[in-house]
Amino acid sequence: MGTLTSVAFAAAVNIRFRSFHRENIKTTITTLPKWQKRLCFSSTEDSHRFRIAKCLGNDENSNRDDSIGENGETHKSSVVKTATFEEEDEETSKSSSTTSSSNEFGSDKTSMPSTIDPTYSSFQIDSFKLMELLGPEKVDPADVKLIKDKLFGYSTFWVTKEEPFGDLGEGILFLGNLRGKKEDVFAKLQRKLVEVASDKYNLFMIEEPNSEGPDPRGGARVSFGLLRKEVSEPGPTTLWQYVIALILFLLTIGSSVELGIASQINRLPPEVVKYFTDPNAVEPPDMELLYPFVDAALPLAYGVLGILLFHELGHFLAAVPKKVKLSIPYFIPNITLGSFGAITQFKSILPDRSTKVDISLAGPFAGAALSVSMFAVGLFLSTEPDAANDLVQVPSMLFQGSLLLGLISRATLGYAALHAATVSIHPLVIAGWCGLTTTAFNMLPVGCLDGGRAVQGAFGKNALVTFGLSTYVMLGLRVLGGPLALPWGLYVLICQRTPEKPCLNDVTEVGTWRKALVGIALILVVLTLLPVWDELAEEVGIGLVTTF
């Protein structure tokens, strides 16, 4: 039992603690400002058994003429009332659950207002609706049911679960148990999909995400993803993309010419050198003096551009038999190498991983073949007395930038030629060197570079993650690439970090010889980008090594 006494209440309060309008009270009540009209006060006894709260200016009760107590009587005067009640009053509990929370306080636990602003909650809902409206079109639920009933079954793939599929959950992923050979089941499902839904959807066979174990038939467990064609297939090349590609190509031509000019810097006429180095020189030199200088720089520019175009030609020649569409190349200019290569996108979905490997390797192999030819011919001409007038002077430190190319140059040119401050070489050596370095950078196994695509196709997406992290670490520590590691790493992070999208059949592995080709290519990439350390350079005589 408990006893609570209230003194000089502004309104009579019954055991249910209803609040009453002030017009029913004979005592004089001072009119409160608007900001105080909904101010609530509460007081609690030391026993903490009961709480009384009184709210002034309750709008919901403003039209009430009287207040009804527990016994049904009307109270119109201020009284002092003592209420004695049981701690566990069943009647009070029932009345608390049925009366309005705005004017009754018959429960020990008063409902707390939500801490979330209604405006923010409404904004969240509107944002989700906007994302759904502007996002890619999702698969029709009616089509999902139809495809599930018509395509899948006991003899192909028994569906046990469905999940969202795609970057924004715009597709459906069917999980279950495979009931046949992967390739045969997938081919059968693709034929049925065309019969049921025509060309409306694309079906992907991928490895089951978060699989708890391998498939009983061998290999990874598979699942099938369904996406609308307009969502899963890349869009056509737009006009502004052609404009950007043209601008980048012109800039790449300029950077290649600049590389050729830099290689011929020792051949500048004395008048031109004096004009640019003497602050007192006023009269500019005759521009005709630069014509022979520019003509001598163009062969190197032609060589660099030829390697780039041959690289892209390899991609396109490999894509045509596979009926894969490629975008126009977006060449990336660079003043050190002439170019960082080009960004070439797939404009159609790849059918399988073997196709991804073939197209990805075709470009680097074509570019590397032409680069090796130029490099070899250039080294041979560098030793011929008849080509002495065509040779250019380069710092011997250049040959320390690549372990593989430095050792080949050392074996061809000899100790005396490389163990000096400068080395006389043919411009084709520089063109081949730049082409091989650019090809090696593009074959790094990261993102959607040629090397990343090849590794993803040959060894799977999990292997690409491991290779990619290792590549980023080695670039960050400048283990690979030397002074070009930082700009190349930034370029990859900005433009090429995202892995390629899965193929239609992203489960069937490639053959052993394709894996071997990718492995050999990666070894050559490391040897090309690995600099010659000082101890080895001093021992074999590549450049002049200064030790302290």
UniProtKB/Swiss-Prot annotation:
Its EC number is 3.4.24.-. Its main location: plastid. GO terms for molecular function: metalloendopeptidase activity. GO terms for cellular component: chloroplast; chloroplast membrane. It is a multi-pass membrane protein. Induction: By ethylene. Down-regulated by dark. Residues 61-116 are annotated as: Disordered. It is found in: Plastid, Chloroplast membrane. Expressed in roots, leaves, cotyledons, hypocotyls, stems, flowers and siliques. Residues 1-18 form a transit peptide. Keywords: Chloroplast, Developmental protein, Hydrolase, Membrane, Metalloprotease, Plastid, Protease, Transit peptide, Transmembrane, Transmembrane helix. Residues 61-76 have a biased composition (Basic and acidic residues). InterPro entries: EGY1-like, Peptidase_M50. One of its GO terms (biological process) is response to ammonium ion. Disruption phenotype: Reduced chlorophyll accumulation, defects in chloroplast development and abnormal hypocotyl gravicurvature. The keyword Transmembrane helix applies. It holds the Pfam family Peptidase_M50. The chain crosses the membrane at residues 242-262, 290-310, 326-346, 361-381, 388-408, 416-436, 474-494, 516-536. Residues 103-116 have a biased composition (Polar residues). Membrane-associated and ATP-independent metalloprotease required for development of both thylakoid grana and well-organized lamellae in chloroplast. Required for the accumulation of chlorophyll and chlorophyll a/b binding (CAB) proteins (from both PS I and PS II) in chloroplast membranes, and for grana formation and normal chloroplast development. Involved in the regulation of nuclear gene expression in response to ammonium stress and interacts with ABA signaling. Carries out beta-casein degradation in an ATP-independent manner in vitro. Belongs to the peptidase M50B family. This is Probable zinc metalloprotease EGY1, chloroplastic.
